[in-house]
Amino acid sequence: MGSSGLGKAATLDELLCTCIEMFDDNGELDNSYLPRIVLLMHRWYLSSTELAEKLLCMYRNATGESCNEFRLKICYFMRYWILKFPAEFNLDLGLIRMTEEFREVASQLGYEKHVSLIDISSIPSYDWMRRVTQRKKVSKKGKACLLFDHLEPIELAEHLTFLEHKSFRRISFTDYQSYVIHGCLENNPTLERSIALFNGISKWVQLMVLSKPTPQQRAEVITKFINVAKKLLQLKNFNTLMAVVGGLSHSSISRLKETHSHLSSEVTKNWNEMTELVSSNGNYCNYRKAFADCDGFKIPILGVHLKDLIAVHVIFPDWTEENKVNIVKMHQLSVTLSELVSLQNASHHLEPNMDLINLLTLSLDLYHTEDDIYKLSLVLEPRNSKSQPTSPTTPNKPVVPLEWALGVMPKPDPTVINKHIRKLVESVFRNYDHDHDGYISQEDFESIAANFPFLDSFCVLDKDQDGLISKDEMMAYFLRAKSQLHCKMGPGFIHNFQEMTYLKPTFCEHCAGFLWGIIKQGYKCKDCGANCHKQCKDLLVLACRRFARAPSLSSGHGSLPGSPSLPPAQDEVFEFPGVTAGHRDLDSRAITLVTGSSRKISVRLQRATTSQATQTEPVWSEAGWGDSGSHTFPKMKSKFHDKAAKDKGFAKWENEKPRVHAGVDVVDRGTEFELDQDEGEETRQDGEDG
């Protein structure tokens, strides 16, 4: 690292002096990485303004025969900072003021060369980095319809990659730092939006599959998404690859045994390979190897690298001894952060169709809950309790009628829900009301509906039958759907929360934020398995639905999902607590599936069902733990062995629990994130947005 004998700890002044002395009289730097590491990591210890102030004090107070030489090297160090991290000198007003003061002091001392070295007037604007939500520039020319059936996999992969990179490159050093230190997404909207995009892609994949009425058609959609995943891998977009594979591996899709029977062996083989690539086995060793073998433009699986940062932060203290920086920790953190920062600055050669980008952005802004999606899956292919599922990604375990508890949970705040609806309607009209007359034509509506599964027909929204949909009609439509969701909500239930340490990345079921961390990341309901932040547990609007538990693990038949083509191996099964069948007659009971529209699909249930197994919990039994249905990536192995093999776990990115029970409608608990709409600046990678 070129620490020049600093050892494992040093004061900030010692670090700065060492970095300054590494520049020669011509401003050239030797092969040491220390100056870059210090400039990258300094905000872990003090602000950029404070660092510039320290350098200015050293510049002013320089004395002795070599003071002129030392002052020149300080200016070389400042120039190096400006060249390597120009965005800081455009976005940080305190740093800008301090730099101008630095120039004034140098001018007063008669060092005109020094003044020219720290000139920041030519730095381009990085204002796009701090605009979390931007409006798109409405094009008056032509319209493009993102018809999923007609869009080639490479086109879809490229546009998803464009959205992913645009979200990824806005995440700043302080966003990473805030999450690693505080372990939450509070006051971190940029990172939160990146997570929302991942979730939106995963849910959209599931809904596009479930929007098809026949197993053959659903298999065709799965095949297309597998081809999209292959193209994403070619584009080196690992984060979206994980979202797509995760959506296909979700229990709502993996349980569709009739659909899986229509998949070709080649598709299944490709699915196996993609699933293995994102496996968490060996600390994501397959992904890490593939990622390291790539060069140039690539998008990492952000969660994996954030976990690396958290691990270093927990193990090493920031300071050792008195007022000394832990250089070992600083170096370890810089390895990951330096790579993330450099990848954000990498340019791509994508040429997206901005109309498709805008429509795809809206398509990913979904309001369907995990309950909605899983119930729709059951409607399309009802569960057969007498047969083992042929889809190897589907656990099969006994279930129990839900046990209702006492107590009342407050209803969702209508003000918040209405705000979400207004944002959705505004977003639609902002993108499709091209002449700004307050109406959307049937042609524009068909462009929208092609990518929003289960949206009602045009005539349903067009209440006055004038051939146009007004903003009021669309508002009334969604408000009516919302009221139908709430009118039959019935009593809520008090959760029995317990502070938990999670073994896998997990989502808060209230705010959709990550519960990542090392220990005690959040709270889990001992009765229903709901997970949330400490600050969210009193705000959670979700019924507590208990299920009975068997006294031992031996009666459980569930297993973590396997490869899409292989039956579960008996020597690799994680067993979960079994449950006993209830005695209530549910023949007369029914559920009503409320999708994103007001349309309902009623289905009779022979028995209540619970969701699939999850990897959120450890494999051992713990009294009071409920199983939790969630988005998991399948465990898989390429070969079968008679002897027990090492289990392979997979990253879990969503933790909204799908549950089905008799006589209760869906409660919408989705969190709305308004995705970015302005693409104009982002297409110029080397221009004004850097």
UniProtKB/Swiss-Prot annotation:
Pfam families: C1_1, EF-hand_7, RasGEF. A zinc finger (Phorbol-ester/DAG-type) spans 494-544. Residues 420-455, 458-484 form the EF-hand domain. The keyword Calcium applies. One of its GO terms (biological process) is Ras protein signal transduction. GO terms for cellular component: guanyl-nucleotide exchange factor complex; perinuclear region of cytoplasm; plasma membrane. InterPro entries: C1-like_sf, DAG/PE-bd, EF-hand-dom_pair, EF_Hand_1_Ca_BS, EF_hand_dom, PE/DAG-bd, Ras-like_GEF, Ras-like_Gua-exchang_fac_N. PROSITE patterns: EF_HAND_1, EF_HAND_2, RASGEF_CAT, RASGEF_NTER, ZF_DAG_PE_1, ZF_DAG_PE_2. Ca(2+) 1 binds at residues 433, 435, 437, 439, 444. It comes from the Eukaryota. This is Ras guanyl-releasing protein 3.
